[in-house]
Amino acid sequence: MSISGLFLILFLLLHTTINFFAVIDVLLGTWGAPAGEGWYASGCWFMATPVIDIMVPILALGFAVHIIYAGILSYGNYKARGEVRYAVANKTKAESWASKNMLVLGVIVLGFVAFHMSHFWAEMQYVEWFKGEHVAPESVYALMELTFGNIWMVLIYIVWFAALWFHLTHGFWSAFQTIGWSNKVWEKRLMLLGNCLATLFCVCLTVTAIVGYLVANGVIPGSVL
């Protein structure tokens, strides 16, 4: 599960970077520009290349392995604790709220991944793969505005980003611990790195959602709708 988790973090790094290109477009005045001029349009074009087409099934397999193994481990731990789970015991130093709720956080994250895919993947890659329709560059910006133009949608996504933050802060360093790449010296360093990465991801994604809202509602000029 640790290997699949680290693999998914790498994909999240790519995904966050491409989404943040939309913010760069706003700063440079290239919102709505075609691929080659607009950063976000270029990123979306890259996500439709054969390299990514090959990666998508691998990513889906990685998600499946991660989810199934997480469920097996959680059920095994639940059964192993038995009545002990009701007892009051001293909490170890390494325990955290996130570590005790990884399964719940994972379910929330998974649910929103499906929700997110219904808004973006289904309207872009799915259309190109299964319907043979080319998605125009301006459409990716319009999709961003339509999705984040509603303040409630932005707030829902921010809740998702918060759950993702908690899941990543524990999952990152514990993945290295599981494969034996962590010790007393590196544990705190990996925890700090995990916190920094999770914060960077979630701040970038939150800013992207807010920028989409501001453009869609005319606060920032350049709407394509």
Where do the PLM segments sit?
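Membrane-embedded alpha-helical bundles that constitute the cytochrome b-like, heme-associated redox core
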Residues: M1-L225
